[in-house]
């Protein structure tokens, strides 16, 4: 359980490691630590650690990239936080099922990547269309992830798989 707390803290720290990108917002390292939580702690403990991080943010501890509090559930980006929990689980589960190798760690990370974006994009669609009354199609939301988010997170998958391989 100590490791769960440590990874919850690492995900929180990752939210504040913000890399500015010209003409865009910023890029954080949260996803990197979410992947490592699943790869190193396994499915259950990885999901618990990321779930603790999300729970702390929802009760008001300002550990999300843009603060904290229960109102965060109405932000279009909250779906990615939900996706992080499932991603840590899926990444850990795939890692547990496959033989230890960089290729398999990368496969586990990519499974987490797909889960994070699937949940995040659908949640953003629901919040924008039904809560914020800002019409947006799933396609437009998906395409809005390409300039920075998806390529950057793909690189984080490569790095996390390499880091996990070096821990073995």
Model-predicted regions and their roles:
Residues 46-50, 105, 141:
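Alpha-helical transmembrane segments and their helix-entry boundary regions
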Residues 1-49, 59:
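Hydrophobic transmembrane alpha-helices
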Residues 167-168:
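Conserved small/polar residues in nucleotide/adenosyl-binding loops
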Residues 78, 138-159:
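Individual transmembrane alpha-helices with interfacial aromatic-anchor signatures
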Residues 11, 15, 49, 57, ...:
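Alpha-helical transmembrane segments of multipass membrane proteins
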Residues 2-6, 13, 71-118:
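Short helix-perturbing small/polar motifs within transmembrane alpha-helices
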Residues 15-26, 54-87:
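Interfacial aromatic-anchored transmembrane helix boundaries in multi-pass membrane proteins
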Residues 61-66, 124-143:
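Interfacial helix-loop-helix junctions of multi-pass membrane proteins
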């Amino acid at each position: 359980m100590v490791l769960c707390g440590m990874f919850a803290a690492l995900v929180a720290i990752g939210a504040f490691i913000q890399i500015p990108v010209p003409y865009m917002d910023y890029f954080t390292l949260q996803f990197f630590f979410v992947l490592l939580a699943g790869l190193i702690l396994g499915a259950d403990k990885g999901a618990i650690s990321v779930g603790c991080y999300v729970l702390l943010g929802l009760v008001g501890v300002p550990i999300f990239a843009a603060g904290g509090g229960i109102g965060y559930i109405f932000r279009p980006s909250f779906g990615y936080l939900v996706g992080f929990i499932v991603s840590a689980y899926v990444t850990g589960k795939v890692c547990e099922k496959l033989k230890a190798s960089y290729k398999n760690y990368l496969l586990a990370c990519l499974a987490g990547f797909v889960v994070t974006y699937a949940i995040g994009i659908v949640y953003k669609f629901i919040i924008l269309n039904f809560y914020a009354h800002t019409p947006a199609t799933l396609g437009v939301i998906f395409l809005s992830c390409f300039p920075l988010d998806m390529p950057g997170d793909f690189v984080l998958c490569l790095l996390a798989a390499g880091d996990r391989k070096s821990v073995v």
